[in-house]
């Protein structure tokens, strides 16, 4: 019987195991998960903290026992893989509850260990990060047990912004600090102005170019010299791939610790695959490396690996587009394609407009700021970004499909919109981007 070992039981690992079982009823599948829970909805954790999502079962939908019963897949939580012997095809596992070590053999090994939260290194009972359900429970219980009223959020990436909004929704007084002037780095920085506008309109204090110097009990001392008391501190200062244990093997990593994979999610070592936040791949539409630690990529990787193991070798991964979106109070910010700083690899032009999301005479019309970058040599799309209160997601999704299909900026004029006054214009914003580009 073929033995398949999966490292990690969250989005990538659990989904991959489930997809393998769908196509393969016979192999023995075992998942080793170093933490307490499996298959939690990590994208939903901030909303659970904010009581927007009230039911625990909605963010923690399945247990190892149920997974075993329904899918005949063994999940061992609190079991951490600490080493890989790719010559003998074994992994070394430690039971984190008993400290017992043992070896397990595999025919196929799938690495989906995810990423870990970076830490500022301060030793305090008041400081938390948010990466898993255990972190979520700790934050939730701390707020209740200590009747926390005043929170500090450190960092201004999309997770920090979601945490801030949800702490505010829960009734806490929140302050945001960030060590640079660049926030939400997946967006064009000038389009992030709505973030500051939303903070200002709610009188939420924020300071850029600010850092923590020390934490003593409730008292936080900042680089600026300001000292202030907080009941709870949430760090959101980036992540790193959980790949330290992979260094024991011959699996190739890049200089940042990401696992290199091909279009089948194979590593350089036979019978070892990787997916999720731990990998580096390429963009789909341009020849540049890409790390996209988001849910879509993990789920796509799970499907491709399962198909590969089932013998369907023609199903491959064609690369990332990096499509991303975040809600911040009344606004939505989204982008697709390469990062702004990667545009320097190309000769490019930019087209933008700021227009109502649907017919102006129909109630509820709000503006969307839409921006598209294209390569002036072949006129293919490189990047797009949008911000607004409504209609942002569908424009970015359409432009994602356009990039996937290698459409030119001019061909956006041919996009046939689903038009009625409550939804769009006869010439949609995406069409207008194409028309505006004709003279460029």
Swiss-Prot record:
Names of required cofactors: FAD
Catalytic activity line of the entry: NADP(+) + 2 CoA = CoA-disulfide + NADPH + H(+)
Binding-site residues for substrate, renumbered to this chain: 15, 19, 22, 39, 42, 71, 299, 427
GO MF annotations, alphabetized: CoA-disulfide reductase (NADPH) activity; flavin adenine dinucleotide binding; NADP binding; protein disulfide isomerase activity
InterPro entries the record matches: CoA_disulphide_reductase (IPR017758), CoA_disulphide_reductase_staph (IPR023536), FAD-bd_OxRdtase (IPR050260), FAD/NAD-bd_sf (IPR036188), FAD/NAD-binding_dom (IPR023753), FAD/NAD-linked_Rdtase_dimer_sf (IPR016156), Pyr_nucl-diS_OxRdtase_dimer (IPR004099)
Binding site for NADP(+): 151-166
UniProt KW keywords: FAD, Flavoprotein, NADP, Oxidoreductase, Redox-active center
Catalytic residues of the enzyme: 43 (nucleophile), 43 (redox-active)
Origin superkingdom: Bacteria
Protein EC: 1.8.1.14
Transmembrane region(s): none
Binding site residues for FAD: 8-33, 267-277, 419
Entry note: cofactor: Binds 1 FAD per subunit.
Family: Belongs to the class-III pyridine nucleotide-disulfide oxidoreductase family.
Subunit structure, interactors included: Homodimer.
Family annotation (NCBIfam families): CoA_CoA_reduc, PRK13512.1
Notes on the domains: Contains 2 FAD binding domains and a single NADPH binding domain.
Function, as annotated: Catalyzes specifically the NADPH-dependent reduction of coenzyme A disulfide.
Extra information: Reduction of disulfides occurs by a thiol-disulfide exchange reaction, but involves only a single catalytic cysteine residue that forms a stable mixed disulfide with CoA during catalysis.
Descriptive protein name: Coenzyme A disulfide reductase
Species, as recorded: Staphylococcus haemolyticus (strain JCSC1435)
Phylogenetic classification of the source organism: Bacteria, Bacillati, Bacillota, Bacilli, Bacillales
Name of the coding gene: cdr
């Amino acid at each position: 019987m073929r033995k398949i070992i999966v490292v990690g039981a969250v989005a990538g690992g659990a989904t991959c195991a489930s997809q393998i079982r769908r196509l393969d009823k016979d192999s023995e599948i075992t998942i080793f998960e170093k933490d307490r829970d499996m298959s939690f909805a990590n994208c939903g954790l901030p909303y659970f903290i904010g009581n927007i999502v009230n039911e625990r079962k909605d963010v923690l939908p399945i247990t190892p026992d149920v997974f075993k019963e329904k899918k005949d897949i063994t999940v061992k939580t609190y079991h951490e893989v600490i080493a890989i012997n790719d010559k003998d095809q074994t992994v070394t596992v430690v039971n984190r509850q008993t400290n017992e070590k043992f070896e397990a053999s595999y025919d196929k090994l799938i690495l989906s260990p995810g990423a870990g939260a970076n830490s500022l290194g301060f030793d305090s009972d008041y400081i938390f990060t948010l990466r898993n359900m255990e972190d979520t429970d700790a934050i939730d219980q701390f707020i209740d047990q200590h009747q926390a009223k005043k929170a500090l959020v450190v960092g201004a990436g999309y997770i920090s912004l979601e945490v801030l909004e949800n702490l505010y929704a829960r009734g806490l007084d929140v302050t945001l600090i960030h060590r640079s002037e660049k926030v939400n780095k997946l967006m064009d920085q000038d389009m992030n102005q709505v973030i500051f506008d939303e903070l200002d309109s709610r009188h939420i204090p924020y300071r850029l170019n600010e850092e923590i110097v020390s934490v003593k009990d409730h008292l936080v001392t900042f680089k600026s010299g300001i000292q202030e008391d907080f009941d709870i501190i949430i760090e959101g200062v980036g992540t790193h791939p959980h790949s330290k244990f992979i260094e024991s093997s011959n699996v190739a990593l890049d200089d940042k610790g990401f696992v290199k994979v091909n279009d089948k999610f194979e590593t350089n070592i036979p019978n070892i695959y990787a997916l999720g936040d731990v990998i580096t791949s390429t963009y789909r539409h341009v020849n540049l490396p890409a790390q996209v630690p988001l849910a879509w990529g993990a789920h796509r990787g799970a499907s491709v690996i399962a198909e590969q193991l089932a013998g369907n070798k023609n199903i491959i991964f064609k690369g990332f587009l990096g499509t991303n979106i975040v809600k911040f109070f009344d606004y939505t910010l989204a982008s697709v394609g390469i990062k702004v700083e990667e545009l320097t690899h190309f000769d490019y032009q930019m087209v933008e407009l700021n227009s109502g999301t649907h017919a102006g005479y129909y109630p509820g019309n709000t503006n969307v700021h839409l921006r598209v970058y294209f390569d002036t040599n072949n006129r293919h799309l490189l990047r797009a970004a949008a911000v607004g209160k409504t209609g942002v997601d569908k424009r970015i999704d359409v432009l994602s499909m356009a990039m996937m299909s290698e459409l030119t900026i001019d061909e956006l004029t041919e996009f046939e919109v689903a038009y009625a006054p409550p939804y769009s214009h006869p010439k949609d914003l995406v069409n207008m981007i194409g028309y505006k580009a004709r003279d460029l």
